[in-house]
Amino acid sequence: MADWTRAQSSGAVEEIVDRENKRMADSLASKVTRLKSLALDIDRDTEDQNRYLDGMDSDFTSVTGLLTGSVKRFSTVARSGRDTRKLLCGMAVVLIVAFFILSYLFSRTRT
């Protein structure tokens, strides 16, 4: 009779252990699914950011081209002669004064 009771209790223990294993396997599967979803979200976000950076690269390239051309033209004007230098200095002074006047007017309109 003792052997039969032992067999019955070991069967109950096996059943409890089996249920616990199934519960833990389901929990693990849920965590793996969440991790997979996070990995896919990170992948999508990375692709979006790469596209954005590629767009910025082309924008910076075009701006660099524009600035290079402007600097070359400015250098040519600066080298061309004394009269041009006087004109260039006068234009610079006018632009600086206009900047200060506009900044003063904008600060007055904000308050």
Curated annotation (Swiss-Prot):
Superkingdom as given in the UniProt entry: Eukaryota
Species annotation: Rattus norvegicus
Descriptive protein name: BET1-like protein
A GO-annotated cellular component: Golgi membrane
PANTHER family named in the record: GOLGI SNARE BET1-RELATED (PTHR12791)
Gene name of this polypeptide: Bet1l
PTM sites of type Phosphoserine: 9, 37
SUPFAM superfamilies listed in its UniProt record: SNARE fusion complex (SSF58038)
Keyword Transmembrane carried by entry: yes
Primary residence: Golgi
Role description: Vesicle SNARE required for targeting and fusion of retrograde transport vesicles with the Golgi complex. Required for the integrity of the Golgi complex.
Residue numbers on the Vesicular membrane side: 108-111
